[in-house]
């Protein structure tokens, strides 16, 4: 089993290389339909599996198309990683959609609307308090 420092280094190297491949080398038109960026790479402790989290901007159809293109490009990505990196075994690559940015945006919108909701609730409480007296 590899040390956590080595796993971290391999993870960052995979992230950099896959980002370069997305920009210049993956020719699948489906990958270009949405703006894609690699947000995180999780490598297993034995360096046999790599989960590549990607953030895709665009419509839901573009996201689905882009994910299909990435899944079909996974063998190419693995082969390229094997040629570029000096590892005994190249990790199996899987692409997963990272929705953390969408969740963060949703939470920010809720927090931004919170003062308005509290003010509306206070007004309703004041109105109902007058009716009871």
Curated annotation (Swiss-Prot):
One of several proteins that assist in the late maturation steps of the functional core of the 30S ribosomal subunit. Associates with free 30S ribosomal subunits (but not with 30S subunits that are part of 70S ribosomes or polysomes). Required for efficient processing of 16S rRNA. May interact with the 5'-terminal helix region of 16S rRNA. One of its GO terms (cellular component) is cytosol. It comes from Synechocystis sp. (strain ATCC 27184 / PCC 6803 / Kazusa). Coiled coil: none annotated. Its main location: cytoplasm. The keyword Isomerase does not apply. This is Ribosome-binding factor A. The gene is rbfA. NCBIfam families: rbfA. It is found in: Cytoplasm. It comes from the Bacteria. Monomer. Binds 30S ribosomal subunits, but not 50S ribosomal subunits or 70S ribosomes. Pfam families: RBFA. Signal peptide: none annotated.
């Amino acid at each position: 089993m590899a040390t956590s420092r080595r796993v971290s280094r391999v993870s960052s190297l995979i992230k950099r290389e896959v980002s370069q491949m997305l920009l210049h080398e993956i020719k699948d038109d489906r990958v270009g339909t949405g703006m894609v960026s690699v947000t995180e790479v999780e490598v297993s402790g034995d360096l046999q599996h790599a989960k590549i989290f990607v953030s895709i901007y665009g419509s839901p159809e573009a996201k689905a198309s882009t994910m299909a293109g990435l899944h079909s490009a996974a063998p190419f990505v693995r082969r390229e990683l094997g040629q570029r990196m000096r590892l005994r075994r190249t990790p199996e690559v899987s692409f997963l959609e990272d929705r953390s940015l969408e969740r963060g945006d949703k939470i920010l919108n809720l927090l931004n609307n919170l003062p308005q909701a509290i003010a509306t609730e206070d007004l309703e409480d004041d109105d109902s308090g007058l009716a009871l007296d």
